[in-house]
Amino acid sequence: MKLGVKLFGLISWVLMASGCANLSAGNLFSHYSDQNQEVYQAVVAGNYANAEQLQSSDVGGEILGNFEKGRISFLAKDYPTSLKALEESDRAVRVQQDRATISVSETATSVGSLAVNDNLNEYQPADYELGFLHLYLGLNYLQKNDLEGALVEVRRANQVQEAARKAREKELKSAEKDLKNQGMSANLGSVLASYPDAGKKLSAVQNGYLFYLSGLLYEASRDLNSAYVDYRRALAVMPDNKQVIESTMYAAKKLGMREDLRLLEKRYGKAPTGLNKSQGRVIVIDEQGVVEALQGWRIDLPIFDSRGNGAIYSLALPYYPKRGAPRFSDVALNGTKLPSSTLADVNAMAQNDLNERLTTIVIRQAIRVWAKDRIRKEAAKKGDDVGNILFNVWNTLTEQPDTRSWQTLPAQVKTPHKL
């Protein structure tokens, strides 16, 4: 029985060491997707006002909780609340990024997560999520007619994109080499933007929506040179998007980029004629669906040793379920349906992020199983059946997958077009 008391004391120490930020009954005995399910389903159903009422930043923490709150409030057209929440998450991200060294509390939290589950770790937003943070901050500034504020955010978003690309330069170059070996024709956008021609791998790392919106905002501010830079980047990411092609060719023609325009026309056909002073362009950006939420895969394995001592080894990992993308009605103009092209596939970005993290997740899972087993064996060795039983129950209840991600983002973004 003494070891049972010691085990209880060890568990108590782990919980206290983990700190208050991520410690909750939900994080101990459940996971984020389960806790956020009502909110997620309300957003999927388009019931944004209800989702806004249900959402609580306590579930996701200061960063992720405010990501969700900012996005839901934006969908509900509650722009002041959206801006406030996204600014709060932005400040929290800056604090996280500005830490020069690992603090004692962070080390304790990491130790706690190895004894419990990864939900006790501080949430580290993915690169694509940081890009969307600045995108929606920028759109909120546009709602206030603050073009300069929106431009500041797209510049920050572009810095995130550049850092993400450089961090994966080796993988992108490898993907580019594979495409060349398969005889795939060169992506002209990649050539013009000096980007790796990495096909779907590039679009899972770089956000065409961000680049295109950035180009539009620069064009609105009469900075066509900067707009052309981002249009070319968007073309590198989404080389078949008709709206991106049109905007890139329009900017090249307006700027007198003759060689670029020649290459563009050779690849895509004649550039569209310019607009006269009485005409304007209407750009439609269509956010569709809701990004997939991570789900938990779990298995409990009862195993007995030579002495007949039983143990339950629990494994829990996050995964994205394979579901077909829902179909949405085409945008219509004057009763005529407009064909649309994909500008961003957020599900692909989310899946790529999980793929990149999965090795680390599995390693931590293996270490956690080993650490928990050492405690269990100590209990079994000293003949403390109560301690052994308590540990098995604790292990089974607390082994939860880390399913945290920004779950209210769109599934994909499209641009209806009419050339």
Which positions does each model-derived feature cover?
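Boundary/linker segments of alpha-helical solenoid repeat arrays
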Residues: 62-64, 92-105, 161-173, 235-263
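Alpha-helical segment of the N-proximal tetratricopeptide repeat
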Residues: 29-57, 68, 217
